[in-house]
Amino acid sequence: MTASLHIILDTDPGIDDAAAIAAALFAPQLDLQLITTVAGNVSVEKTTRNALQLLHFWNSDIPLAQGAATPLLRPLRDAAYVHGESGMEGYDFVDHQRQPLAKPAFIAIRDVLMNAPEPMTLVAIGPLTNIALLLMHYPECACNIRRLVLMGGSAGRGNFTPNAEFNIAVDPEAAALVFRSGLEIVMCGLDVTNQAMLSPDFLNKLPALNRTGKMLHSLFNHYRSGSMRTGVRMHDLCAIAWLVRPELFTLQSCFVAVETQGQYTAGTTVVDIEGRLGQPANAQVALALDVDGFRQWVAEVFAYAP
C-alpha cells in the first residue's frame, strides 16, 4: 500500500505517545515527515530524549526538532505521576548519539510545510505550544496546513482538573489561539480517548508480536492511565487512528472555546454541542468510538512494526 497522507507529528513522549509514534511510523497509509517535541508529560529535554530513543529503537531516520520548554504564559505542570520521572519508565533503551535538528520545532514545521508540494496534516498529541508559536510567527503557514488533528480537550469532565483535559490545561493560551485560528480542526478528546482501552487480554499478547510489542508491553506495565489488570487507555493513539480509520469515530461540528481566565476552569474546552452560543463551528469533535474496531486496527498497525 502506498502512503498517501503526509503528516507532521508534535508530541510529548510519554508512554501512550510511544504507541502513537509507532502507529505514525508504521501505518502504511501514513508518511511521517517530521517529529517535533514539546514540554508536557515531562520536560522538553526528556520528551526529546524519549523520542530520539524511540527513533533509534526503530532505526528510523525521521528528522526530529525540539520545541517549547514552557507554555506561552504559564509555568509547566507535567504528568510524571502518570508516565514516570523519565516519561517512559519501564524499558531500558540502548545508548545512541542522535541529536535533534539545530532549529526549534516551530521553524522546522514551517520549513517542511513551505517546501511541501501540497498542504500537509499536522497531528498534535501534546500541549499546543509549538502549533501556537508557528501560527504566531508564521501565520502564512496556515494555507499549507490541510488540517490539524489533535488529542486534547473534553466535552465533559477533565483528567487534570475537574473540567480540563491535560494537554489543553497545560497551555490554555496556546490552545485558545489554535482554536481561534481558522484551521480545520479534528478534536479527539477524552470523550473518545477514555473509551480507547486496550484490554488485559490484548496487552498480554503484545510480547509475542515483535520487538515493538515487547517494548510497549514493558512501558504499559508502568503506565498509570489504567493498569495491566484492568486495561490501559490509549489517548494519543486515537489521533493516529482517526487519520487511518475515521469511520471508527462519530464526529460532530461544534464551536469550541478554551477558558483561560477561570480560577477553577482554566484549560476547560467549552464544546457547544447544542449550538447555544450561536457561534459558527470551528472543530469536528469526536464524541464516540467503535472500540472493537479500534482494537482491531491497533493490532494490525503494531504488527507492521519490527
Curated annotation (Swiss-Prot):
Q: Which GO terms describe its biological process?
A: purine nucleobase metabolic process; purine nucleoside catabolic process; pyrimidine nucleobase metabolic process
Q: Do you know which InterPro entries this protein is assigned to?
A: Inosine/uridine_hydrolase_dom, IUNH, Nucleosid_hydro_RihC_nonspecif, Ribo_hydro-like
Q: Which UniProt keywords apply?
A: Glycosidase, Hydrolase
The enzyme's first-digit EC class, named in words, is hydrolase
What intrachain disulfides are recorded? none
Task: List the EC numbers from the record.
Answer: 3.2.-.-
- Active-site residues (renumbered): H235
User: Which Pfam families does this UniProt record tie to the protein?
Assistant: IU_nuc_hydro (PF01156)
Q: Which GO terms describe its cellular component?
A: cytosol
MF terms in GO: purine nucleosidase activity
Listed HAMAP family: Nucleosid_hydro_RihC
Q: Which family does it belong to?
A: Belongs to the IUNH family. RihC subfamily.
State the function annotated in the UniProt record.
Hydrolyzes both purine and pyrimidine ribonucleosides with a broad-substrate specificity.
In terms of NCBIfam families, this protein maps to: PRK10768.1
PANTHER family attached here?
A: INOSINE-URIDINE PREFERRING NUCLEOSIDE HYDROLASE (PTHR12304), NON-SPECIFIC RIBONUCLEOSIDE HYDROLASE RIHC (PTHR12304:SF15)
Q: What is this protein called?
A: Non-specific ribonucleoside hydrolase RihC
Q: Say which species the protein is native to.
A: Salmonella typhimurium (strain LT2 / SGSC1412 / ATCC 700720)
This chain is encoded by the gene named rihC
